[in-house]
Structures are given as C-alpha cells and as structure tokens.
Amino acid sequence: MIQNEIPIPAEALQWKCIESKIDSERLHYGRFAISPLRPGQANTVGIAIRRALLGEIEGTCITYVKFEKVTHEYSTIMGIQESVHDILINLKEIVLKSNSYKTQEASISILGPKRVTAEDIVLPSSVEVIDATQHIATITKAVYFNIKLGIRKDRGYRIENPVKYEDGNFAVNAAFTPIRNANYSVHSFENEKEKQEILFIEVWTNGSLTPKEALREASQSLINLFIPLLHEKKERENRKLENKDEYNVLRSCFSLTNIGEVRKEISFKHIFIDQLELPARAYNGLKKVDVHTISDLLNYSQEDLMKIKNFGKKSIQQVVEALQKHFAIHLPKNKFSIND
C-alpha cells in the first residue's frame, strides 16, 4: 500500500508532499515522505527534523500589554466583560506574522459597545494578523478600550519576569513556535532484495507559515549546525598558512637563535587565558584590560599588572603561578628584567 502511494526512486533520495490541507486559518496540515533510506537512517533524520520543527522555527507573538489605570492582573475594567487576566490569555493566542526582529508596538483604541477582535489591532506595516476573527474582549458599554502591545519575533518559549513590568504593564509568556505539532513514522520495504526505509513526517502549523515552509526552515537550521564541521579542514589549512606567513615575517626580523621563541609567541596568540584556570577576580581583571590570550598577557610584567585597577598582589601571584604551572613561563617583575 505504501509503495503504491509513493513512487520509490531507484537511487535518488527524494522529498514528496503527499498530503496538504487547511483545516482553518490557524491550522494547516502537511504530510511528507522521504525515500529511499538505508535501515536506521529514517529514525536519525526523523528525530532531528521533529526537534528542529518544535524548537528552531521562528514565530511572532505579543510579549507585553499596557493597560490604562490597571493595577494587577485580576483587575476588572469598567464596561469590559472580561477580566485583565482573560484579556491577556486571549492576546497570547493571537497569531501574527512578521519579517522584523525588532520589538515593535501595536495598539487598540476603540469605542464600545463592541466585540473586539484581532482585526481591531493597529499594527506596524511589517506585522500582519493571520486570523482577524480571534476574540480579544467584549465592550458592553459606551466606553473606550485602550491598550498598547509589544510584539517580537523569536523562537521557543519565553517566560517573562513580572517584576520588570509595572504601572499597568503586563508580561505575556510567549510561545513563539508556529508549530502546533510534529510527528514522524518509519516504514520498511524491500527493493531489489535490499531493505530500505521511508520516513513520513506530519506537520501542523498555526497558519503563519505553511508546513512545507516549516519543514524547509527546520532542514536549513540543521544544515547550518553542520556547515562549520564541513569547513573545519579548510579553516585548519587556512590557519596553517596564516601561521606560516606570520612566522616568515617574524623570522626576517629575528636571528636564527630566536626562532624557537618566535614559534612559541605565534602559538600563544591562539591560546586563551581560560587555560590558566585563574580565579574569577584575576580572570575578570585581565579581561577588563583586553588581555584575552597568553600572548596578550606576556606583554605585561608583574609591575605592569600592579597598575591594573583592583588587581592586587594575590592576583598577580596567581597569574605568575598559573603561567609557570601550565606553560613553564616565568613572568618578569618588570620589562627590563630577564631572569629575575
């Protein structure tokens, strides 16, 4: 049955969308298949794609709301049927789409009596509402309903600290993910006496993007994670060339008797002071004066370190001992001493 539903290519790996439907403005569904895969590969890909779908896809949410003359979340507003708490829950569910990563402001200012929906939100040009019928509040009297909204694009979940918000400002614990659900299943089959697998992936979105777009974004996020590994060899070769050029320049400036020291200096440029395992006070003191590598540190004498603000004798002693312990380097007391 599965083989009849999806044509199995003899060699090339192929993605296919085998079902797509829109149940409502805020519920889109897509079913996809990838084949042929070797035994075990379908599970590997399925787990990775599902986690990327649920955790890596960006969405847009309302993150804070400012009410007028409201002191706490469980207040009621004259002429408004819902409590502030209920309004916040309704606003949290509003589905938005944005192409901007900046925190943006929107507002609602409307005279009742009226049923307030997402259509009544005055949005910046870069943000749009997916379902204009989503309910926000009910104005039962001839009063104004005025609120300001903060909107942001992000990924995952964000639980805001309520202490940060006061004077009518209320945080909204945003669920940025536009993915309602994601599942996968694996089916085996035999092709020319060889066992192979088909991976099925099901995706439900909130309508701010299609399941196909979500799957593409999830795949791209996984690719981006592995790209540095693919380029590691090339980067290593480039670093070798850089070090060789650096070494040749320095060699022309120093006599042959100093070549060993030059080599050491070059390598120290790529070793960070984290390797010294210094206590926090000494480590932070060095960082404040832009000492990031061992090479940077060797530009200082003990006398120079004394001039760093809040860098006392104890910190200097810790640096001296750490250099000796990890790299067998003696830090001179001053720049003019060599073997003191």
Swiss-Prot record:
Substrates-to-products reaction catalysed: RNA(n) + a ribonucleoside 5'-triphosphate = RNA(n+1) + diphosphate
Superkingdom of this protein's organism: Eukaryota
Primary subcellular site in the record, as a coarse category: plastid
Region ranges (Alpha C-terminal domain (alpha-CTD)): 263-340
Record bears the keyword Plastid: yes
Subcellular location: Plastid, Chloroplast
Gene Ontology cellular-component annotations: chloroplast; DNA-directed RNA polymerase complex; mitochondrion
InterPro entries xref list: DNA-dir_RNA_pol_insert (IPR011262), DNA-dir_RNA_pol_RpoA/D/Rpb3 (IPR011263), DNA-dir_RpoA (IPR011773), RBP11-like (IPR036603), RNAP_asu_C (IPR011260), RNApol_insert_sf (IPR036643)
Alphabetical keyword list: Chloroplast, DNA-directed RNA polymerase, Nucleotidyltransferase, Plastid, Transcription, Transferase
Keyword match Glycosyltransferase: no
EC number: 2.7.7.6
GO terms, molecular function: DNA binding; DNA-directed RNA polymerase activity; protein dimerization activity
GO biological process, one term: DNA-templated transcription
SUPFAM superfamilies listed in its UniProt record: C-terminal domain of RNA polymerase alpha subunit, Insert subdomain of RNA polymerase alpha subunit, RBP11-like subunits of RNA polymerase
Region (Alpha N-terminal domain (alpha-NTD)): 1-233
Membership in a protein family: Belongs to the RNA polymerase alpha chain family.
Notes on the domains: The N-terminal domain is essential for RNAP assembly and basal transcription, whereas the C-terminal domain is involved in interaction with transcriptional regulators and with upstream promoter elements.
Function recorded in the entry: DNA-dependent RNA polymerase catalyzes the transcription of DNA into RNA using the four ribonucleoside triphosphates as substrates.
Subunit structure: In plastids the minimal PEP RNA polymerase catalytic core is composed of four subunits: alpha, beta, beta', and beta''. When a (nuclear-encoded) sigma factor is associated with the core the holoenzyme is formed, which can initiate transcription.
Listed NCBIfam families: rpoA
Name of this chain's protein: DNA-directed RNA polymerase subunit alpha
Lineage: Eukaryota, Viridiplantae, Streptophyta, Embryophyta, Anthocerotophyta
Gene transcribed to yield this protein: rpoA
